[in-house]
Amino acid sequence: MGQGSSKHADSKLDSYPSFSRSDTQGSIKSLKSLKTVLGKGKDSNHDRRTSTDTTHSRHRYPETPPSLPPPPSPGILATSPAVLQKHQQEDSGNSSQSPTSPHPSNQPAMLSPSTAASQHHHHHSSSSSYAVSPTSPTSPTSSGPIGSNFDSASEHNGPVYPQDQQGPVIIPNSAISSTDPDDPETVVSLNVDEMIQRLIHVGYSRKSSKSVCLKNAEITSICMAVREIFLSQPTLLELTPPVKIVGDVHGQYSDLIRLFEMCGFPPSSNYLFLGDYVDRGKQSLETILLLFLYKIRYPENFFLLRGNHECANITRVYGFYDECKRRCNIKIWKTFINTFNCLPIASVVAGKIFCVHGGLSPSLSHMDDIREIPRPTDVPDYGLLNDLLWSDPADTENDWEDNERGVSFVFNKNVIRQFLAKHDFDLICRAHMVVEDGYEFFNDRTLCTVFSAPNYCGEFDNWGAVMSVNSELLCSFELIKPLDQAAIRRELKKSKRSGMAIYQSPPAEQVTQSV
């Protein structure tokens, strides 16, 4: 970007609503109350354990990366051709068998709904998960798999990536189309597995480096490749469980590695991330690059939604722009922004759980409204897309009121009830707000906020959480303990699941089911 472009971006930024308050909740309501509540409770959390306490066999980090394992088949995108073909061939009367977990020690203990309800308020127990049953015990009654009526989803316009390939996945530069006339670097071939290994090695390293372990040309090629995948899949993803749902991570790369340690590195688990990958944290580049590479490697089992921070104006203010400028160059930031503009917006899991970064919108009448959002697109100052990324639930008298963030609205319990009833959903799962325990229910467990960045910004002693949805639509939570950077480095150094164990992690034995 030249100097003129920079001035244009600055003038556009000036016209955007004020973000003087913290935009990752709570505006005043949550963040300030957290400081008072959490400041006196550091020691009370020591008895709460996380799944990262589980021991595994130790391996040295390999000098030559073996290939990553193939993903579970057919993937969890219900509109993927593999899923549709599978269910066209199956007898509708066949029932699925209950699978066993490849890592039983990492699976959260499932509680009955009544037990979970009684334990939800006792967060200082030794268990790292609290199961709830917000969704219907039976699958939605439909004649075919979810999304089977969405014809465009089966038209894959991007390159076909070899999911079942046993050897290293190499994407030649000829398969990566460049549609941006301002491409910062020449597109190069991608050795996806080797790049993933490089990034994970950085995550386990005790030293932080100013430089990025990937070259600018490699970063550009990653963005180009993943952008094609985003555009080849629907704006509204329709997924089948099991899946793990992750909230904000905000460039806290070491905590992202801890999250994968706890929940399983891909493809041992299916993932849906709810956005806000960059800004605030010190390693936004490593964070977003690892997520993009996993999306390229496992396109039908690893999904990323757009958050309000995946936007040019916000990244200019909250750190990602400065990190790109300092560690790469401004053109790399522009390439990321062009990729962010292609991210999907929302997801429906098993036809019952509506997932989005922010919340609801008064402009949202039908799910087709989301499907018809054009991409690539910037985030507008108001309207449907802005609300989906920015709105918050609140105890207000009116259905819709102005948001104290200065952007979008807040919506009350009545709006939630009407939305769920109209679309036959049971739960809204969203992120966008820091909460003390990593997850927090609202309105009789019809809405859940998930936040996955523990010790947020190094200032709040909050836990991180991941919501797991199993094939029976039972939801549970795995918690990430808040640690400072020194403690995180010590934990990762002692980790029993680094090195080759990552690459030998088997695919999920829970075969994804259409509902």
From Swiss-Prot:
<dbReference type="Pfam" id="PF16891">
    <property type="entry name" value="STPPase_N"/>
</dbReference>
<feature type="compositionally biased region" description="Low complexity">
    <location>
        <begin position="126"/>
        <end position="143"/>
    </location>
</feature>
<dbReference type="InterPro" id="IPR031675">
    <property type="entry name" value="STPPase_N"/>
</dbReference>
<keyword id="KW-0597">Phosphoprotein</keyword>
<dbReference type="GO" id="GO:0007165">
    <property type="term" value="P:signal transduction"/>
</dbReference>
<feature type="compositionally biased region" description="Pro residues">
    <location>
        <begin position="63"/>
        <end position="74"/>
    </location>
</feature>
<feature type="compositionally biased region" description="Polar residues">
    <location>
        <begin position="17"/>
        <end position="30"/>
    </location>
</feature>
<feature type="binding site">
    <location>
        <position position="276"/>
    </location>
    <ligand>
        <name>Mn(2+) 2</name>
    </ligand>
</feature>
<dbReference type="GO" id="GO:0005783">
    <property type="term" value="C:endoplasmic reticulum"/>
</dbReference>
<feature type="region of interest" description="Disordered">
    <location>
        <begin position="1"/>
        <end position="186"/>
    </location>
</feature>
<feature type="binding site">
    <location>
        <position position="432"/>
    </location>
    <ligand>
        <name>Mn(2+) 2</name>
    </ligand>
</feature>
<keyword id="KW-0904">Protein phosphatase</keyword>
<dbReference type="GO" id="GO:0004722">
    <property type="term" value="F:protein serine/threonine phosphatase activity"/>
</dbReference>
<keyword id="KW-0378">Hydrolase</keyword>
<dbReference type="GO" id="GO:0016791">
    <property type="term" value="F:phosphatase activity"/>
</dbReference>
<feature type="compositionally biased region" description="Polar residues">
    <location>
        <begin position="91"/>
        <end position="109"/>
    </location>
</feature>
<feature type="compositionally biased region" description="Basic and acidic residues">
    <location>
        <begin position="40"/>
        <end position="51"/>
    </location>
</feature>
<dbReference type="GO" id="GO:0005634">
    <property type="term" value="C:nucleus"/>
</dbReference>
<dbReference type="InterPro" id="IPR006186">
    <property type="entry name" value="Ser/Thr-sp_prot-phosphatase"/>
</dbReference>
<keyword id="KW-0963">Cytoplasm</keyword>
<feature type="binding site">
    <location>
        <position position="250"/>
    </location>
    <ligand>
        <name>Mn(2+) 1</name>
    </ligand>
</feature>
<keyword id="KW-0464">Manganese</keyword>
<dbReference type="GO" id="GO:0000324">
    <property type="term" value="C:fungal-type vacuole"/>
</dbReference>
<dbReference type="InterPro" id="IPR050341">
    <property type="entry name" value="PP1_catalytic_subunit"/>
</dbReference>
<dbReference type="InterPro" id="IPR004843">
    <property type="entry name" value="Calcineurin-like_PHP_ApaH"/>
</dbReference>
<feature type="binding site">
    <location>
        <position position="357"/>
    </location>
    <ligand>
        <name>Mn(2+) 2</name>
    </ligand>
</feature>
<feature type="modified residue" description="Phosphoserine">
    <location>
        <position position="514"/>
    </location>
</feature>
<protein>
    <recommendedName>
        <fullName>Serine/threonine-protein phosphatase PP-Z</fullName>
        <ecNumber>3.1.3.16</ecNumber>
    </recommendedName>
</protein>
<feature type="modified residue" description="Phosphoserine">
    <location>
        <position position="505"/>
    </location>
</feature>
<dbReference type="GO" id="GO:0005737">
    <property type="term" value="C:cytoplasm"/>
</dbReference>
<keyword id="KW-0479">Metal-binding</keyword>
<feature type="binding site">
    <location>
        <position position="276"/>
    </location>
    <ligand>
        <name>Mn(2+) 1</name>
    </ligand>
</feature>
<feature type="binding site">
    <location>
        <position position="248"/>
    </location>
    <ligand>
        <name>Mn(2+) 1</name>
    </ligand>
</feature>
<feature type="active site" description="Proton donor">
    <location>
        <position position="309"/>
    </location>
</feature>
<dbReference type="GO" id="GO:0046872">
    <property type="term" value="F:metal ion binding"/>
</dbReference>
<dbReference type="Pfam" id="PF00149">
    <property type="entry name" value="Metallophos"/>
</dbReference>
<comment type="similarity">
    <text>Belongs to the PPP phosphatase family. PP-Z subfamily.</text>
</comment>
<feature type="modified residue" description="Phosphoserine">
    <location>
        <position position="18"/>
    </location>
</feature>
<dbReference type="InterPro" id="IPR029052">
    <property type="entry name" value="Metallo-depent_PP-like"/>
</dbReference>
<dbReference type="InterPro" id="IPR011159">
    <property type="entry name" value="PPPtase_PPZ/Ppq1"/>
</dbReference>
<feature type="binding site">
    <location>
        <position position="308"/>
    </location>
    <ligand>
        <name>Mn(2+) 2</name>
    </ligand>
</feature>
